[in-house]
């Protein structure tokens, strides 16, 4: 359970929102604080990219899918594992989808 601006938001045991429609930027900030991530414009770009990906494909991207899709849309400098790992050190697909308020990617342990 997360308290965001006085509103209780349900999460699973790993901290992913149970109801993605409860996501907003304040939720992302609260989750980022728990994950020890200071959000920058680069983080927001990935968070919104992941949310758009989910809207289009109805699935949270695993790391390979995320890297490939980002490289196609944002270029090789942002669509690579090193760049994403720098932003999300506990696992780009795992942390980016968590901050985006989406379900945990199926291939994340």
UniProtKB/Swiss-Prot annotation:
Protein name listed in UniProt: Sulfurtransferase TusE homolog
Annotated active site: 108
Xref: InterPro entries: DsrC-like_C, DsrC-like_dom_sf, DsrC-like_N, DsrC/TusE
Keywords, comma-separated and alphabetical: Cytoplasm, Transferase
Domain of life: Bacteria
Pfam families tied to this protein: DsrC (PF04358)
Cellular compartment(s): Cytoplasm
Gene symbol of the encoding locus: tusE
EC annotation from Swiss-Prot or TrEMBL: 2.8.1.-
GO biological process, one term: tRNA wobble position uridine thiolation
SUPFAM superfamilies: DsrC, the gamma subunit of dissimilatory sulfite reductase (SSF69721)
One cellular component (GO) term of this entry: cytoplasm
Primary localisation category: cytoplasm
Record family assignment: Belongs to the DsrC/TusE family.
GO MF term (any one): transferase activity
């Amino acid at each position: 359970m997360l308290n965001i601006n006085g509103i209780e938001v349900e999460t699973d045991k790993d901290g992913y929102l149970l109801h993605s429609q409860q996501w907003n930027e304040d939720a992302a900030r609260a989750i980022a604080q728990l994950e020890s991530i200071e959000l920058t414009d680069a983080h927001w770009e990935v968070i919104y990219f992941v949310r758009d990906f989910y809207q289009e494909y109805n699935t949270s991207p695993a790391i390979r899918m995320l890297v490939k899709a980002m490289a196609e849309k944002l270029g090789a400098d942002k669509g690579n594992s090193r760049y994403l790992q720098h932003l999300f050190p506990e696992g780009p697909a795992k942390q980016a989808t968590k901050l985006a308020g989406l379900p945990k990617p199926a291939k994340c342990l």
